[in-house]
């Protein structure tokens, strides 16, 4: 058992924020502490303090740690019925209101399934009209996987046969996304809790991530998302992430998953 666990963890969160810029206090403490403690025990460190000393010196360990605190569960068109609503109900509205290039942000994009799903949807719905997709995540290693765009069949269960054949090249046991979809996406490292949010988006997609944030962390993220949307732009979130008072952020409810900037 790690001695003085509570005191040690509080010290750890302070120095991680000060030296690494990661604010663990904005994640739910019980879940985050349990996850980090399990990792420390696995790595055979005695205290959070000892672990932090090595974390600052070991780039590989730091990458592992960032991967640990990042939630990376994704698939193409996850919860397909909600993507159908996006394509058939929300996107036509955005296209009607938007002028010029349609700007989309896939926030906390994990290994790329979400932004590539957006690119496939845009390709068939927008046609020759220009669009730009920004895809961001906290973890550099997971972003590298997203750029490569190679996936196992289990990650593609929601895809139709036509989508598999038109958007991917089969490579043995894996599927490689076609280059034209990669070219339409800008991948970038971004921390939702601390980094600057670009402005002027027509659509922001951030699903099944904020459930791991504290109330304060969620409030900050929703406020910044609202500021990043153009008037009439839409925020698409996960089914368990309902915004209780959207008007506080200048948003109005389209349904439980879509919020429009008023």
Swiss-Prot record:
Residues 1-262 form the CheR-type methyltransferase domain. S-adenosyl-L-methionine binds at residues 72, 74, 78, 114, 137, 191-192, 207-208. Pfam families: CheR (PF01739), CheR_N (PF03705). It is an enzyme of class 2 (transferase). Keywords: Methyltransferase, S-adenosyl-L-methionine, Transferase. It catalyses: L-glutamyl-[protein] + S-adenosyl-L-methionine = [protein]-L-glutamate 5-O-methyl ester + S-adenosyl-L-homocysteine. It comes from the Bacteria. PROSITE patterns: CHER. Its EC number is 2.1.1.80. One of its GO terms (molecular function) is protein methyltransferase activity. SUPFAM superfamilies: Chemotaxis receptor methyltransferase CheR, N-terminal domain (SSF47757), S-adenosyl-L-methionine-dependent methyltransferases (SSF53335). The keyword rRNA-binding does not apply. GO terms for biological process: methylation. The keyword Transcription does not apply. Methylation of the membrane-bound methyl-accepting chemotaxis proteins (MCP) to form gamma-glutamyl methyl ester residues in MCP. This is Chemotaxis protein methyltransferase. It comes from Listeria monocytogenes serovar 1/2a (strain ATCC BAA-679 / EGD-e). The gene is cheR.
């Amino acid at each position: 058992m790690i001695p003085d666990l509570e005191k040690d963890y509080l010290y750890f969160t302070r120095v991680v924020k000060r030296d690494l810029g990661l604010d663990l206090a904005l994640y739910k403490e019980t879940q985050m502490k349990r996850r980090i403690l399990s990792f420390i025990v696995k790595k055979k460190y005695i205290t959070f303090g000892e672990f932090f000393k090595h974390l600052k010196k070991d780039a590989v360990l730091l990458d592992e740690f960032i991967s640990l605190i990042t939630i990376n569960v994704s698939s193409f068109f996850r919860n397909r019925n909600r993507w159908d609503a996006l394509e058939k109900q929300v996107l036509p509205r955005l296209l009607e209101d938007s002028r010029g290039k349609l700007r989309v942000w896939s926030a906390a994009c994990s290994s790329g399934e979400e932004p590539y799903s957006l690119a496939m949807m845009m390709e068939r719905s927008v046609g020759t009209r220009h669009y730009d997709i920004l895809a961001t995540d906290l973890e550099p290693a997971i972003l590298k996987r997203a750029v490569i765009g190679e996936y196992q069949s289990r990650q593609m269960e929601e895809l139709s046969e036509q989508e598999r054949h038109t958007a991917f090249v089969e490579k043995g046991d894996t599927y490689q996304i076609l280059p034209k979809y990669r070219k339409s996406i800008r991948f970038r490292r971004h921390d939702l809790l601390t980094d600057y949010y670009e402005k002027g988006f027509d659509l922001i997609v951030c699903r099944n991530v904020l459930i791991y944030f504290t109330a304060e962390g969620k409030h900050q993220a929703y406020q910044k998302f609202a500021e990043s949307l153009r008037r009439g732009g839409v925020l698409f979130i996960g089914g368990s992430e309902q915004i209780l008072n959207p008007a506080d952020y200048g948003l109005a409810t389209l349904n439980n998953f879509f919020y429009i900037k008023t």
